[in-house]
A protein has these predicted regions:
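FNR-like FAD-binding dehydrogenase module
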Residues: 1-387
Length: 387
């Protein structure tokens, strides 16, 4: 906040055009040695910024691209990086800076591919047939695990100029991360839970843009950021209303914040957390915190699903069904049901299970169960933060 002449302070509004450059105060692994994943707990110092947030909000992160990938692209283009180009905001800059900070340089757009096949006879022969609408699925399968750098290396006859190349790129967008802390306990910092994306495909190491950017921010390093407020994904106004939280993996982030908020307020309204990951020994994020919350009553019930700790895989939706009668009872008591995490599979599985619980334990028909779940959502008692 800025100081006014009368001693009061005014709130500073941060957004994409006016971000706050926050520094990392802590970057530590949540996953233990032996885990197949790299998930980080990252704390960001916002002291002196006037930045305010509430539980359920997200933090917008303006990432930069991987410098090694930028150098590989420059090499493939035969450029030194000092060439003059126009960035995504229509401002003059160097090619290297544009690739590092302004443009998305991983996933090729259809526009990029359409121009590529016009410039390269080899690409026209190999990729051209996939660019018709009838081949949409085949194109998606072909592009899986491939990035722009692959097309630059494989089709050098395209002979891109720096200006022509960047003209086909999309703007590098902000990434949103669910905030994993409560301002009531941490007013000067924001916590994130970040799953670092790294994998090999087609002979190259691929890296998630924002997750790798954050994971490689050592303590003291800063980046552009601002808070993206939530509209509905927040705690009930009445602290006595029960809450059911389904947050496997990094989806647990906002629920850590919810529970911290209730801890700070001394609230003992019922709360139930479903958490899942691969292995309890290596991948139980915030285990000590949640165990302590169980002891002091902030967390009423904790149901876990570790998919690889037994021969058959168990996920959070399986635990929901096992506890279906009690879960239904909580819903009848007015509980708010939250889900956070993967939208493509997990959230759909959880939704199907919620319908099944309404049928099996609520005695509802399929149509009545669908109406019940729809009403939960309409009444803001079924809230999602999925991505």
């Amino acid at each position: 906040m800025n100081q006014l002449p009368n001693g009061t302070r005014k709130l500073v509004i941060y957004n994409r055009k006016n971000p706050f450059f926050a520094s990392v105060s802590l970057n530590k692994k949540l996953t233990k040695e032996g885990s197949e994943k790299d998930t980080r707990h990252i704390e960001i110092d916002i002291s002196g910024s006037g930045m305010q947030y509430t539980v359920g909000d997200s933090l917008a992160v303006q990432p930069e691209n991987d410098p090694e990938l930028v150098e590989d692209i420059l090499k493939a283009l035969g450029a030194d990086g000092n060439e003059s180009v126009i960035d995504a905001d229509k401002q003059p800059t160097t090619l290297r800076d544009a690739l590092l900070r302004s443009y998305s340089i991983t996933q090729p757009s259809k526009k990029f591919l359409e121009v590529l096949v016009q410039r390269s006879a080899a690409a026209a022969a190999e990729i051209g047939p996939l660019l018709v609408s009838e081949k949409k699925n085949e194109l998606e399968e072909y592009l899986s695990g491939r990035e722009i750098i692959d097309f630059l290396i494989n089709y050098p006859d395209a002979n891109w100029t720096p200006a022509d190349f960047v003209a086909q790129l999309k703007k590098l967008l902000i990434r949103l991360y669910s905030i994993a802390s409560s301002p009531k306990l941490h007013p000067e910092s924001i916590h994130l839970t970040v799953a670092v994306v790294r994998y090999y495909s087609h002979g190259r190491l691929r890296k998630g843009v924002a997750s790798t950017f954050l994971a490689e921010r050592s303590e003291g390093k800063s980046f552009a950021t601002f808070v993206q407020p939530t509209k509905h994904f927040h705690l009930p106004d009445d602290p006595e209303i029960p809450i059911i939280m389904v947050g496997p993996g990094t989806g647990v982030a906002p629920f850590r914040a919810f529970l911290q908020d209730r801890l700070a307020d001394g609230v003992k309204g019922k709360s139930w957390l479903f958490f899942g990951e691969q292995r309890r020994l290596y991948d139980f994020f915030y285990e000590e915190e949640f165990t302590e919350m169980l002891k002091n009553g902030v967390l009423t019930k904790l149901s876990t699903a570790f998919s690889r700790d037994q021969q058959y895989k168990i996920y959070v939706q399986h635990r929901m069904l096992e506890e279906g009668k009690l879960l239904w009872d909580w819903l009848q008591q007015g509980a708010v049901f939250y889900v956070c995490g993967d939208a493509s599979r997990m959230a759909k599985d959880v939704d199907r299970t919620l319908h099944e619980i309404a049928e099996k334990f609520g005695g509802l028909s399929s149509d009545a169960a669908a109406e019940y779940v729809q009403k939960l959502a309409a009444d803001h008692r079924y809230l999602k933060d999925v991505y």
